[in-house]
Amino acid sequence: MVPWLRKVITKREKAVADEGQWDRRSLLRGAAVVAGAAAAAPLLGGAARAQAGGGDADALFKAGKFEQAGRAYEEILKKDPTNLNAARQRGYVGLLSNKFPDAEKHLTMALKLAPDDKETNALLADCYIRQDKFSLSVPRWQAAGEDGYAKWFAAFRGEPYQIHGDIARVPWQQMDPSPLVEASVNGGPPKRFTFYTGAPNLSMSATVAKEAGLHAVASQKTDFEGTIIWMYYGVLDSFKLGGIELRNVPVGWSTTESGGDVGTDNDGLIGTWVFYHLLTTFDYAGRSLILRRPTPEAASKVRADAKRAGAKPLPLWLALDHYVHSTGSIAGSGTQVVGVNVGGTGESAAVMPGERAKQLGIRTDYDRPLETFGHSHATTTYPCYPKEIRLGDAVAKEIYCETDPNARINVPWPYGSGIDMWAAFFHPFHKPYNITLDFTNMNVYIARGKAT
């Protein structure tokens, strides 16, 4: 999920899921995130925005032309090895595709140019935690001003996200308003967890955390719509979903100021950090979650199954540590970068900025405004009905969507990916399909019907 596209925020999603604010930094720091806020990253020596061979590397990046942007940044660095923006952005291009040596090389180059640059430090910290190099991430989180994250990841001993088991097929207990599956926490009885790729870490209710014997290694007080909420972060020994068990897992939970649970719709939420350690199929049509150890053999089977189903691989990009992106189209836009949000809740199949809806001539019902929240601030969206929205060969026609006139097309770091967004796809779109996220080969597969 991209930061401006969270449609409905409940206190449960905000605090327990650690994602309702659209960007986890605001919750961990307890800072209010204002829609459209932008941080201007410093450029070494006041260098201008990256230009190469008459083409604008930054414009290529914003447009989602990442390979071309990467080459353009490299050309800049050949001429000017001290260009911080080019080094950092070239590292970011590598990070989007989980090309870790590439990302580390250029982000380390940027770090040497400007050791105190918060954006560089945050990107490099993200690069390390994706590889489970938690200890290396700690000084980078500190330099990025993320003291809570620094304390959290410094608390780990041994290998995080240890995988036991090879495959699990976990049936959904319900589809709506959000999917629920059963999971065991520290060997305890089954608990009801939802899942959402718009959320980062595994999180759970304070009651479940207490039952599991968790203790906090970091905490933060925040104010959500006038309600004081305490966020806690710790280390979970065991999280089991069917035949797959994860050990030594980062986990968060929350309480009201009086110590009570924040919402009771479920017992917790599984975020993208868990899923990028596995090869996961979200089998909407079959109402099940298929989790696999990410081996070459498992990936080969997924590719073969997708080929038989006629599903071509789509690119997968991961921005801001947990926001999944791929390519899709809306109302004849042509192939563009879109957000892909699996799980969660909501009635709209996609959400898009108002400027995009007008640009594409999408029928919008301005007589029926929807008053909701974004970044914990009031906003108003409107129903809209694009003639077609598409992810690969997965298509929905005249389906209910929403548009937000206040949403910006591009939100820079730290509150956005810096990528021009056309739309984000949500829970209702996926219902006729099964969708697989392969974070090793960085592909998305979406096929009609139940997974085989």
Locate each region found by the language model:
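Pepsin/retropepsin-fold aspartyl endopeptidases
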Residues: 33-34, 38, 43, 52-55, ...
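N-terminal secretory signal peptides
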Residues: 1-26, 34-42, 46-49
